[in-house]
Amino acid sequence: MTNIRKTHPLMKIVNNAFIDLPAPSNISSWWNFGSLLGVCLILQILTGLFLAMHYTSDTTTAFSSVTHICRDVNYGWIIRYMHANGASMFFICLFMHVGRGLYYGSYTFLETWNIGVILLFATMATAFMGYVLPWGQMSFWGATVITNLLSAIPYIGTNLVEWIWGGFSVDKATLTRFFAFHFILPFIIAALAMVHLLFLHETGSNNPTGITSDTDKIPFHPYYTIKDILGALLLILALMLLVLFAPDLLGDPDNYTPANPLNTPPHIKPEWYFLFAYAILRSIPNKLGGVLALVLSILILVLVPTLHTSKQRSMMFRPISQCVFWILVADLLTLTWIGGQPVEHPYIIIGQLASIMYFLLILVLMPVASTIENNLLKW
């Protein structure tokens, strides 16, 4: 008798994706982040669902409802902080996952990579709208500043912003629609993640060498199931350490002040995971230019496969490219730091230099380094 998992229409899909899937024998812990992102997404959907049971998306009661969740709802505080810090863990995993893709040349799987970029945009949109929901000072002003950027679009800008706001400022209508979008987007992300996986399983996973691993495959279960479980346990450990010992470490104190349209906070800044993009936005003195740079800072990932000039796929055996890659990582950390600093000397010039470096590294130095390496190897 054939095993039910190989014959049942539904079980067959699960089997081919998570049990009998042929996987490379040498994939390192950098390949754990895909499954960790899945764990993060499930965790965010579950905690978010329970928060939505008690949250009210009305400007007069939103802030109070979040306070009510933390004070009066059974274990409401832990659900709220798991959701808030879960977003940080989500983005840590996302950045690691994208970094892994860049380093090991996984972007040559074009469909998988492009859907990944769409997933990144969708996750950033979800996180932004979620940050608005508690209706604190930083929620309100963050929403005002970021939505206002769309007014830089020529001709239709102002109308577009007022259409998104549902009025002439960020108000009741804005909060309600942001809640609706924040609720629906994670399910769209889950669907896109399945498509992401579908395209990945068309080609099979890449591996650290970048060389085809068709001659050396092992079954996903039990080897990588146990590895993923270990990764998930470590992720949950890190998350719970954050939640139970330093729940407000990554948050902004200004968000504990209810939203007040008449009082602007001294420093408007987003959550830490958007600071690199925020620094790029601020480094350009022109509004439209800043918005374009902001969008391009993420959209540039779509260009990476076309900029791949190396004869090798992975950076494992390419020391010059490795140097460029780690300089890029350092540059992104610099941008993250600058994004959280006030707009004054010397931060302005550092931000501008780091922004120029960011685009220069990806568009020029990466392909140049690859070409140099090809020539050194006489390829």
UniProtKB/Swiss-Prot annotation:
Q: Name one GO biological process term.
A: mitochondrial electron transport, ubiquinol to cytochrome c
Q: What does this protein do?
A: Component of the ubiquinol-cytochrome c reductase complex (complex III or cytochrome b-c1 complex) that is part of the mitochondrial respiratory chain. The b-c1 complex mediates electron transfer from ubiquinol to cytochrome c. Contributes to the generation of a proton gradient across the mitochondrial membrane that is then used for ATP synthesis.
Q: What residues does a ubiquinone bind to?
A: H201
Q: Which InterPro entries does the entry mention?
A: Cyt_b/b6_C, Cyt_b/b6_C_sf, Cyt_b/b6_N, Cytb/b6-like_sf, Cytochrome_b, Cytochrome_b_C_euk/bac, Cytochrome_b_N_euk/bac, Di-haem_cyt_TM
What cofactor requirement does the entry state?
heme b
Q: Which Gene3D superfamilies match?
A: Cytochrome Bc1 Complex, Chain C
Q: How does it sit in the membrane?
A: Multi-pass membrane protein
Indicate yes or no for the key word Metal-binding.
Answer: yes
One GO cellular component term noted in the UniProt record for this chain: respiratory chain complex III
Q: Work out whether the entry's keyword set contains S-adenosyl-L-methionine.
A: no
Report the family membership.
Belongs to the cytochrome b family.
Transmembrane region(s): 33-53, 77-98, 113-133, 178-198, 226-246, 288-308, 320-340, 347-367
- Main localisation, per the record? mitochondrion
Q: Which UniProt keywords apply?
A: Electron transport, Heme, Iron, Membrane, Metal-binding, Mitochondrion, Mitochondrion inner membrane, Respiratory chain, Transmembrane, Transmembrane helix, Transport, Ubiquinone
Q: What else is known?
A: Heme 1 (or BL or b562) is low-potential and absorbs at about 562 nm, and heme 2 (or BH or b566) is high-potential and absorbs at about 566 nm.
What molecular function does GO assign, one term?
metal ion binding
Q: From which domain of life does this come?
A: Eukaryota
Q: How does this polypeptide assemble, per the annotation? A: The cytochrome bc1 complex contains 11 subunits: 3 respiratory subunits (MT-CYB, CYC1 and UQCRFS1), 2 core proteins (UQCRC1 and UQCRC2) and 6 low-molecular weight proteins (UQCRH/QCR6, UQCRB/QCR7, UQCRQ/QCR8, UQCR10/QCR9, UQCR11/QCR10 and a cleavage product of UQCRFS1). This cytochrome bc1 complex then forms a dimer.
Q: Which residues bind heme b b566?
A: H97, H196
Q: How is its cofactor bound, per UniProt?
A: Binds 2 heme b groups non-covalently.
- Protein name according to UniProt: Cytochrome b
Q: Where in the cell is it found?
A: Mitochondrion inner membrane
Indicate which residues the UniProt annotation says bind heme b b562: H83, H182
Q: Which gene encodes it?
A: MT-CYB
